[in-house]
From Swiss-Prot:
It comes from Synechococcus elongatus (strain ATCC 33912 / PCC 7942 / FACHB-805). Cleaves peptides in various proteins in a process that requires ATP hydrolysis. Has a chymotrypsin-like activity. Plays a major role in the degradation of misfolded proteins. This is ATP-dependent Clp protease proteolytic subunit 1. GO terms for cellular component: cytoplasm; endopeptidase Clp complex. One of its GO terms (biological process) is protein quality control for misfolded or incompletely synthesized proteins. GO terms for molecular function: ATP-dependent peptidase activity; ATPase binding; serine-type endopeptidase activity. The active site is at 96 (nucleophile), 121. Pfam families: CLP_protease (PF00574). It is an enzyme of class 3 (hydrolase). It comes from the Bacteria.
């Protein structure tokens, strides 16, 4: 069930679903696994907000366990394609593709709430079929793994060798550890939230 927000205006009351209301404030909320439908919705929202105002920042709030690599890369590429900066905020959990998208925010504008958790790892996949089919899938997952690791190395400032080691298995970080790692730029505390409001 999606919450509804009722607003008073000179012409009476208007009801919005919460996500539409947030979008008016240039806030996109990723609160589920990344799928094709989710990615298409987020890409459309990013493009819409760019068309509305190409100079004003967009805020992507993330509470996601990850999801489809290909769909996540579509969001990532769109974030880097559009003119407005995309500020990212981790609220709860940014794992796997969620962490990748968190790191994809504009430099200096990647943040997390204090008690959030961030997790990076290598892409997961499975293959079945004939030997040649399995070989094709294995080559693709190795390509994706290398691509994701190179992007994370660039976004964090960590050496590629460290990213490769750390993503070999689930690698969890606190918000402050993610700052030290270079995945985000700062931890937002209650005082900072009030100062920006």
């Amino acid at each position: 069930m999606i919450p509804i927000v009722v607003e008073e205006s000179g012409r009476g009351e208007r009801a919005f679903d919460i996500y539409s209301r947030l979008l008016r404030e240039r806030i996109i909320f990723l609160g589920e696994p990344v799928t094709s439908d989710v990615a298409n919705r987020i890409v459309a929202q990013l493009l819409f907000l760019e068309a509305e105002d190409p100079e004003k920042d967009i805020y992507l709030y993330i509470n996601s366990p990850g999801g489809s690599v290909y769909d996540g890369l579509g969001i990532f590429d769109t974030m880097n394609h559009i003119r407005p900066d995309v500020s990212t905020v981790c609220v709860g959990l940014a794992a796997s593709m969620g962490a990748f998208l968190l790191a994809a925010g504009a430099k200096g504008k990647r943040t997390s709430l204090a008690h959030s958790r961030i997790m990076i790892h290598q892409p997961l996949g499975g293959a079945q079929g004939q030997a040649k089919d399995i070989e094709i899938q294995a080559n693709e997952i190795l390509y994706i793994k290398q691509n994701l690791n190179e992007v994370l190395a660039e976004r964090t400032g960590q050496p590629l060798s460290r990213i490769e080691d750390d993503t070999d298995r689930d690698f969890f970080m606190s918000a402050s550890e993610a700052v030290e790692y270079g995945l985000i730029d700062r931890v937002i505390d209650r005082r900072a939230l009030k100062a920006t409001a």
